[in-house]
Amino acid sequence: DAAEPWQLGFQDAATPIMQGIIDLHH
């Protein structure tokens, strides 16, 4: 999969957020 720069930036920003949401639900 070839990721666009904005997709990489989005993933870098979203990962900690998603991890925090997962932590809240567990």
From Swiss-Prot:
Instruction: Cite the SUPFAM superfamilies for this sequence.
Output: Cytochrome c oxidase subunit II-like, transmembrane region
- The answer, when asked if Plastid is one of the entry's keywords, is no
Location in the cell: Mitochondrion inner membrane
What Pfam families is this protein classified in?
COX2_TM
Source organism superkingdom: Eukaryota
Q: What's the chief localization of this chain? A: mitochondrion
The record, for Gene3D superfamilies, names: 1.10.287.90
Enumerate the cofactors the protein uses: Cu cation
Name the job this protein performs: Component of the cytochrome c oxidase, the last enzyme in the mitochondrial electron transport chain which drives oxidative phosphorylation. The respiratory chain contains 3 multisubunit complexes succinate dehydrogenase (complex II, CII), ubiquinol-cytochrome c oxidoreductase (cytochrome b-c1 complex, complex III, CIII) and cytochrome c oxidase (complex IV, CIV), that cooperate to transfer electrons derived from NADH and succinate to molecular oxygen, creating an electrochemical gradient over the inner membrane that drives transmembrane transport and the ATP synthase.
The record's comment on protein family reads:
Belongs to the cytochrome c oxidase subunit 2 family.
Assembly and binders:
Component of the cytochrome c oxidase (complex IV, CIV), a multisubunit enzyme composed of a catalytic core of 3 subunits and several supernumerary subunits. The complex exists as a monomer or a dimer and forms supercomplexes (SCs) in the inner mitochondrial membrane with ubiquinol-cytochrome c oxidoreductase (cytochrome b-c1 complex, complex III, CIII).
What is the name of this protein? Cytochrome c oxidase subunit 2
